[in-house]
Structure formats: C-alpha cells, structure tokens
C-alpha cells in the first residue's frame, strides 16, 4: 500500500536515517580523538642531536629518532652544515637535562622524515615546555599544534619578554625555520 509523501511511515524512515547519521558521526569523532592520543613509552636517551631531536632506546631495544612535538630549536652545527646562534647551547642544555636518562615519551606519530613526534617527560617535567621557557626553543608553527599549545605559547611569550636564552639577540634573532630556508637545510 502506497502512503502519501509526508505520512508517518516516511517520517519514521527519515528519523531512522538521521539517527544512523548522528551515530556514525559520533563514532567518527571518537575514533579520530583516540587516534590523536599519544602512545606512551619509556626509553633511555642515547644521544642528543639538536635542541629538539634525540635518539632513545626503548625497553625492548627499539631505537627511536625523536623530534620534539610543538617546538623548534636553533640549528646546531653538524659536520657539513653550519649552525646558528644558540644552536650548540640548546643541544648542550637538552643533553644536560636528559642525556643518558630514562624518560617518558608521549609519541604522537611520525613526521615526514620518519622521526617520532613526541612530548618528552623527565619525571614530572615537560622537557618540550622547559626548552621553550628557558629560551632554547620557540613554538613550532609549521604544523597545527597537537599538545600543550597554550602552555608552549605562554612560555615563549615570557621568555621573549624576559630576553632569556636565544631571545637575548633581540632584532638579530632568526627563527630556525628562516635559518633552514636561508641555508637550504632539510628538516623541521
């Protein structure tokens, strides 16, 4: 039996489709928020490469090349690549903080160079945040912020205002991104 358009049977069918759509949307949101959750690992820092990059070994022996999430430190000189002011200081400070230590790694996934993007914790200290607060790194603006965004921005603002670390350079300061572009150095 055919019912006229707008009849109760048609309305129930529309309501069922609406409900299914809403449920599917909620499931997608939940799945995407879980995908953004970090995977937590414990690792020993083997070597600090830069003020925002290190090599660590997990409990099961996996070697990780870790890029600190949300920050960008001045480039340290490497064999054939020049460094920028405060590059060595940033690397040395990070080595002083975590070199040879066991750290917690909140891993958010790989970057385009297959490094693990992560927030590093030494006990209760967010090392990414500390590097920014001490003036050895700035907030990374090359990708959407994924973790501790407001805290990183506040720490950078205070470090700039207080002219600590690399911010003592004032108008002579060149961001790591601008330095890499000028020197045509690969990496973020």
Question: Which residues does each predicted region cover?
Answer:
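Small beta-barrel nucleic-acid-binding modules, primarily SNase/OB-fold domains
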Residues: 2-188
